[in-house]
């Protein structure tokens, strides 16, 4: 089984483009990542055959439009889910199997198994109207995994749960999705969920694909600033890109930093001598007590501290703008800043696209 999307375009009734030349390919689990209104839901609706679009959607090599709706074997979960309020949880779960003509003796073990996986076994005989909203949403999700459809489309399935229940809901969906033998497309705003559930991803921004590939590549080798920032904890400043003796360097915070990339790694050597965006993560910035450094550099003090994941994040006001640094303790003295060269990304000032060859 394989899903291919080729140069898919979709316009809103107003004429505004919802999706522009979107392409992806997978035979397993793929994440579609992007902020609200990035085009995730529109893409899933196109794959499901619910929108008119230009381009191609191929299901196991066959064009979507050539496959009768009842033969596409696509199941999908959108936020506007529904359950039968006056039917039991068991009946709600069993419904898709029952309409396919399966016998009770075949249905019951499947329902029992999914109910156990999703924490619904003890409420199987309850009518849905007795359930909490979180439980109703869980029923709708669990129902999706009762049969092993070839193509499963999940639109931010954990997003509608309460804060308390969302983590557990994601864990259950992840476990069920990874057990499936078919294709799973998992759309989410949550970069952490995407990292956990899929090895490959498509990053959408305002209907355009900004990067495809592994989540690891997106983290360490982002194609655009918006991709880098989606993971959080990202600094960016402008500096002049220089070259000397076959090496690239920038001057940050009063220190010359030789980069891991060379001029040959640039998309164009025209960038040398010009302002570029220099990006790096909070964790890639180190502070060195001004009394210990021998390498020069400008001196700073933290202006304020935040706490995040058990660590302090210190704010530093510099000549290049505000910088944030992860630190284990609140440091009160003067220091210089050092940025790890291997973690530096370079971007074009206007397009905010990467300057280096992937």
Which sequence ranges carry the predicted segments?
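ABC ATPase NBD coupling module
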Residues: 63-76, 99, 218
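Short helical segment in ABC ATPase nucleotide-binding domains corresponding to the A-loop/adjacent helical element
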Residues: 90-98, 108
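Conserved ABC transporter NBD signature motif
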Residues: 55-63
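Internal alpha/beta loop-helix hairpins
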Residues: 188-255
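Conserved ABC ATPase "signature" region
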Residues: 105-123, 174-175
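Conserved ABC ATPase signature
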Residues: 127-131, 135
